[in-house]
Amino acid sequence: MRTVTQRVQHASVTIDGQLKSKIGKGLLVLVGIEDKDTQEDIEWLAKKITNLRIFDDENGVMNRSVIEAGGEIMVVSQFTLHASTKKGNRPSYLKASKPDIAIPMYKAFCEEVGLQLGKPVQTGTFGADMKIELLNDGPVTIIIDSQNKE
């Protein structure tokens, strides 16, 4: 499971011209799922993301988590995070899970993030053509891969 987590002032998802969801201050998490991902990956990533100390404390030091900052989280599926650009100029997405595997994993991840956060997360729609609008704060952007725990 690979995520790109961005600290945002606000973010929203629009599908077919209709607002699907939005958040204020918090995290926008783009998540890509591959076949070898497990429930353990879901739990590890959800805990890691909700406890990342990337929000400023009273001294302006990044020392607070999204939970401590009272922030929100939006999770959006993005299979292109598993693109391979090794050969040629056209990315290959063979490592990305097919929907029959990825959809249940995505739903489980959203649910686990919500449990860790203590409130439901906002989401996009799996597989939809979405317009994501965000105001990146910092910018702070963190890439995490559960298959490569650095």
From Swiss-Prot:
Q: Where are the transmembrane segments?
A: none
Its subcellular locations are:
Cytoplasm
Judging by the UniProt lineage, the source's domain of life is Bacteria
Q: Enumerate the InterPro entries for this protein.
A: Daa-tRNA_deacyls_DTD, DTD-like_sf
Q: Which GO terms describe its molecular function?
A: D-tyrosyl-tRNA(Tyr) deacylase activity; Gly-tRNA(Ala) deacylase activity; Ser(Gly)-tRNA(Ala) hydrolase activity; tRNA binding
Q: Which keywords has UniProt assigned to this entry?
A: Cytoplasm, Hydrolase, RNA-binding, tRNA-binding
Intervals of motif Gly-cisPro motif, important for rejection of L-amino acids: 138-139
Q: What is its EC number?
A: 3.1.1.96
Q: Which reaction does it catalyse?
A: glycyl-tRNA(Ala) + H2O = tRNA(Ala) + glycine + H(+); a D-aminoacyl-tRNA + H2O = a tRNA + a D-alpha-amino acid + H(+)
GO cellular component terms given for this protein: cytoplasm
Principal location class? cytoplasm
Keyword 4Fe-4S included in the entry's annotation: no
A GO BP entry: D-amino acid catabolic process
Q: Which Pfam families has this protein been placed in?
A: Tyr_Deacylase (PF02580)
Q: What is known of its domains?
A: A Gly-cisPro motif from one monomer fits into the active site of the other monomer to allow specific chiral rejection of L-amino acids.
Extract the HAMAP family matched here: Deacylase_Dtd (MF_00518)
Q: What's its job?
A: An aminoacyl-tRNA editing enzyme that deacylates mischarged D-aminoacyl-tRNAs. Also deacylates mischarged glycyl-tRNA(Ala), protecting cells against glycine mischarging by AlaRS. Acts via tRNA-based rather than protein-based catalysis; rejects L-amino acids rather than detecting D-amino acids in the active site. By recycling D-aminoacyl-tRNA to D-amino acids and free tRNA molecules, this enzyme counteracts the toxicity associated with the formation of D-aminoacyl-tRNA entities in vivo and helps enforce protein L-homochirality.
Family the UniProt entry places it in: Belongs to the DTD family.
**Could you give the subunit structure recorded for this chain?**
Homodimer.
Q: What is this protein called?
A: D-aminoacyl-tRNA deacylase
Q: Which gene encodes it?
A: dtd
